């Protein structure tokens, strides 16, 4: 599958093969990661990577775009059908690029953004001070209650006080559903636009397994990987023609040059996969598997942020533990379970250490694992955390789990 690469750069070839083996042998439980469809990877590795196509279908600055025009148009139409909206821009290189383009389109420098606090589950692009959005705009944040749920009353009070031009509802580490209707009511109360960032839950949204951002949000952004299982990239959606025109200009020429046509083709392929009936069954499995995992951990007396989960991820709370999120990340990694350390509400440790870990079910569900496997995984996670310094136990668990994961290959033939 990679004949030329093996011949011309054996060093990179071997490293890619090493990563292929790692993905096969480890339990991938980082909530933002997934195994993309094999068809998506084939589209990404096509001759489309050779083509520049600045502009939009039938409005290009380069010649020779008659084929890629058809490809991008197909991606747009499939995105509109998938998300049940009237306008879609499929050129954003990433979710962060998509969010920055929305701000560029709809805000002026130093306008006000209200988004979820980073330690409560928000994303860097929702106004974090260290990000571009926190530097180019005035950013404010809302958070969660003591029970770990979004505090909508607090969000309203903050919005009334600061009068933001745009409110962002979305997250990178929040285990519950977003109430888009409530956020729209808050936005209308203060005359703000509402951006729904569904990067994490898009695969659940399009299958009816999570509340839909439309008709409540003025504009919606998402990545195309994560729970959608498409290529790494971003999309922007709206039902407002005026906003759509501004978004297009904000992407090109506002924040990007040439679109990545091989990625746009892969997005189109991914959207077609998402429209199939079996994708709904996958989304249901993602949610049910996470419920099994949460139950197993709670039965072992482990504390979860918000007490559980309503989507594809959960957050473990170590605020009252002698070990940190970083410690847990390393210990579980030694056992072949890949998670990520994560800040949590009430955080007392550094963002590089943290008091929690984030765990997702999307990738292992894509491999076909079900309730039986997730119960086993929950028990093994508990065993590791309850004896966190026992390296021999970690290595023993790794071998046990390797025997299990070998029954669920990532791909049925080498693709790398």
Curated annotation (Swiss-Prot):
Pathway: One-carbon metabolism; tetrahydrofolate interconversion; Amino-acid biosynthesis; glycine biosynthesis; glycine from L-serine: step 1/1
Keywords annotated in UniProt: Amino-acid biosynthesis, Cytoplasm, One-carbon metabolism, Pyridoxal phosphate, Transferase
Listed Pfam families: SHMT
Modified residues (N6-(pyridoxal phosphate)lysine): 226
Gene Ontology biological process terms in this record: glycine biosynthetic process from serine; tetrahydrofolate interconversion; tetrahydrofolate metabolic process
GO CC, one annotated term: cytosol
Catalytic activity as recorded in UniProt: (6R)-5,10-methylene-5,6,7,8-tetrahydrofolate + glycine + H2O = (6S)-5,6,7,8-tetrahydrofolate + L-serine
EC numbers for this chain: 2.1.2.1
Binding-site residues, (6S)-5,6,7,8-tetrahydrofolate: 118, 122-124, 242, 350-352
InterPro entries referenced in this protein's UniProt entry, alphabetically: PyrdxlP-dep_Trfase, PyrdxlP-dep_Trfase_major, PyrdxlP-dep_Trfase_small, Ser_HO-MeTrfase, Ser_HO-MeTrfase-like, Ser_HO-MeTrfase_PLP_BS, SHMT-like_dom
Residues the record marks as site: Plays an important role in substrate specificity: 225
Example of a GO MF term: glycine hydroxymethyltransferase activity
Cofactor entry: pyridoxal 5'-phosphate
Compartments, as annotated in UniProt: Cytoplasm
PROSITE patterns named in the record: SHMT (PS00096)
Subcellular location, principal: cytoplasm
Family: Belongs to the SHMT family.
HAMAP family linked: SHMT
Quaternary structure annotation from Swiss-Prot or TrEMBL: Homodimer.
Chain's role: Catalyzes the reversible interconversion of serine and glycine with tetrahydrofolate (THF) serving as the one-carbon carrier. This reaction serves as the major source of one-carbon groups required for the biosynthesis of purines, thymidylate, methionine, and other important biomolecules. Also exhibits THF-independent aldolase activity toward beta-hydroxyamino acids, producing glycine and aldehydes, via a retro-aldol mechanism.
UniProt name for this protein: Serine hydroxymethyltransferase
């Amino acid at each position: 599958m990679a004949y030329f690469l093996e011949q011309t750069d054996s060093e990179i070839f071997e490293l890619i093969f090493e990563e292929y083996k790692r993905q096969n042998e480890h339990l991938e439980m980082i909530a933002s990661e997934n195994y993309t469809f094999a068809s998506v990877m084939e589209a990404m590795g096509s001759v489309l990577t050779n083509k520049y196509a600045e502009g939009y279908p039938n409005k290009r600055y380069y010649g020779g775009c008659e084929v890629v025009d058809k490809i991008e148009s197909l991606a747009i139409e499939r995105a509109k059908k998938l998300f049940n909206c009237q306008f879609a821009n499929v050129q954003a290189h990433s979710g962060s690029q998509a969010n920055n383009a929305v701000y560029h389109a709809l805000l002026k420098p130093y306008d006000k953004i209200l988004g979820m606090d980073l330690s409560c589950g928000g994303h860097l692009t929702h106004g974090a001070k260290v990000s571009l959005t926190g530097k180019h705009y005035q950013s404010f944040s809302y958070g969660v209650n003591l029970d770990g749920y979004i505090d909508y009353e607090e969000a309203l009070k903050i919005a009334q006080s600061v009068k933001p031009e745009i409110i962002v509802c979305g997250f990178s580490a929040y285990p519950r559903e977003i109430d888009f209707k409530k956020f729209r009511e808050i936005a209308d109360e203060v005359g703000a636009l509402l951006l729904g960032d569904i990067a994490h839950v898009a695969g659940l949204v399009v299958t009816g397994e999570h509340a839909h951002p439309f008709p409540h949000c003025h504009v919606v952004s998402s990545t195309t990987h994560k729970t959608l299982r498409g290529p790494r990239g971003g999309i922007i959606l709206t039902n407002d023609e005026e906003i759509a025109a501004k978004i297009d200009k904000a992407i090109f020429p506002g924040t990007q040059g040439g679109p990545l046509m091989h990625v746009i083709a892969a997005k189109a392929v991914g959207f077609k996969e998402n429209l199939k009936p079996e994708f709904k069954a996958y989304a249901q499995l993602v949610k049910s598997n996470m419920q099994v995992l949460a139950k197993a951990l709670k039965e072992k007396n482990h504390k979860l942020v918000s007490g559980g989960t309503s989507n594809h991820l959960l957050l473990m709370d170590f605020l009252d533990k002698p070990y940190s999120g970083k410690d847990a990340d390393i210990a579980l990694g030694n056992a072949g379970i890949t998670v990520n350390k994560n800040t949590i509400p009430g955080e007392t440790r550094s963002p590089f250490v943290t008091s929690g870990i984030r765990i997702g079910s999307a990738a292992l569900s894509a491999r076909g694992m079900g309730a039986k496997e997730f119960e086993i995984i929950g028990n093994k996670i508990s065993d590791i955390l309850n004896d966190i310094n026992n390296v021999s136990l970690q290595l023993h668990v790794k071998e046990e789990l390797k025997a299990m994961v070998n029954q669920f290959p990532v791909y049925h033939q080498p693709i790398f």
